[in-house]
């Protein structure tokens, strides 16, 4: 990591930048943008939940990559809990620089003993990164169900 790259927790003051960064993620999934009120409500929920953290890569004061890590307490594996990483995103102008890898390595070095990761099916470069970091796509099978929109 260069001196210009900082990996850190996202703070409330970063929310506008984080939401702008996630436009790169949500556009691919054709998701509508959140209102300011929705963003603030979600942030308050995150602040109240000690097991949820957003991590970011900052370069020259700008957030250019981020993801969320959720750690859930567990009675398995000595009570160390398990983590789930989701919503890994890098700003399109900063891709192919190894920033997502640095972010993931940081999290893997500082989190619990078991970490799962969810990724879209058609993201071959991201999947290669995750496999290079030791994630095993054959170890378990994941299922996702979305609630119908009202």
Label every model-predicted segment.
Residues 44-56, 84:
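A short helix-loop-beta-strand connector motif used in the catalytic cores of GNAT acetyltransferases and
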Residues 73-85, 95, 138:
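A conserved beta-turn-beta hairpin within the catalytic core of GNAT-like acetyltransferases
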Residues 6-20:
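A short beta-loop-alpha structural element at the N-terminal edge
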Residues 56, 62-71, 84, 89:
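Conserved beta-strand in the GNAT
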Residues 23-43:
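Conserved GNAT-fold acetyl-CoA-binding loop/helix
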Residues 94-106:
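Conserved acetyl-CoA pyrophosphate-binding loop and the N-cap/start of the following alpha-helix
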